């Protein structure tokens, strides 16, 4: 039996927008992000990133992805931050940041190191450059993960519930970093349970349930005047 995890998704993200994706667990939010950067492949539809075609459906109904190298290059336009920090435990913080730009993008090592130090300053962790991940708090590790994604110079940042595995007191420091990125007009798609962030920082909120976008709109409309019954029930539960 075929299970459609996502269906009927129609989503436009403009440059500089911050999209908050909310909804109950199992509604397809994380899968949506994974489809955007090709961690999951779609079986119908079109994905266009920064004006470039990543995937399209042919006249025969078959999904065709851009060729290998081109596909990877387009996918690299998106930085991804996961629930779990996924830092390399055997590398220092600085080494974690420079690994992919040097090895994957073949950029100049000395220049990448300078840029990485600037990014660590940006996320408030300059003094942790030579520290190993195990010596950091969860909030610090997640901020390193954000800096590591930014080191690849993405056009778009994808966040998959970046604070869900953090204690409440550590959540604030990660959200603060994300808020600063939003103020710098970084294009962001954020799957989150943090309704305050969605309400205050997002330019658009998308509510998903059962693999579909049930409602989308400006934060003030979604939170103060929700039309969809599922959204109304969801907000009653999470905003108690």
Question: Which residues does each predicted region cover?
Answer:
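ABC ATPase "signature
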Residues: 216-217
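Catalytic Walker B motif of ABC-type/P-loop ATPase nucleotide-binding domains
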Residues: 157-160
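The feature captures the beta-strand-to-loop junction immediately N-terminal to the Walker
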Residues: 22-24
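Helix N-cap at the start of a conserved alpha-helix in ABC-type nucleotide-binding domains
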Residues: 168-170
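Conserved signature/switch motifs of ABC ATPase nucleotide-binding domains
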Residues: 131-134, 152, 184
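Short coil-to-helix segment of the ABC ATPase nucleotide-binding domain corresponding to the Q-loop/switch region
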Residues: 91-99
């Amino acid at each position: 039996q075929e299970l459609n995890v996502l269906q009927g998704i129609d989503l436009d993200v403009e440059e500089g927008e911050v999209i908050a994706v909310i909804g109950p667990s199992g509604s397809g939010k994380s899968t949506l992000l994974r489809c955007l950067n090709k961690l999951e492949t779609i079986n119908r539809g079109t994905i266009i990133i920064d004006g470039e075609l990543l995937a399209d459906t042919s006249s025969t109904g078959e999904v065709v992805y851009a060729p290998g190298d081109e596909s990877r290059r387009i996918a690299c336009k998106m930085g991804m931050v996961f629930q779990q920090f996924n830092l390399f435990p055997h590398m220092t913080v600085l080494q974690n940041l420079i690994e992919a730009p040097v090895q994957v993008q073949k950029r100049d090592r000395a220049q990448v190191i300078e840029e990485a130090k600037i990014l660590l300053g940006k996320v408030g962790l300059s003094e942790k450059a030579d520290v190993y991940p195990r010596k950091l708090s969860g909030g610090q590790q997640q901020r390193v993960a954000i800096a590591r994604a930014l080191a690849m110079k993405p056009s778009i940042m994808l966040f998959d519930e970046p604070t869900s595995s953090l204690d409440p007191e550590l959540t604030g420091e990660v959200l603060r970093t994300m808020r600063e990125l939003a103020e710098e007009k970084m294009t962001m798609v954020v799957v989150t349970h943090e309704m305050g962030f969605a309400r205050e920082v997002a330019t658009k909120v998308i509510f998903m349930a059962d693999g579909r976008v049930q409602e989308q709109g400006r934060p003030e409309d979604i939170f103060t005047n929700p039309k969809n019954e599922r959204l109304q029930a969801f907000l009653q539960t999470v905003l108690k």
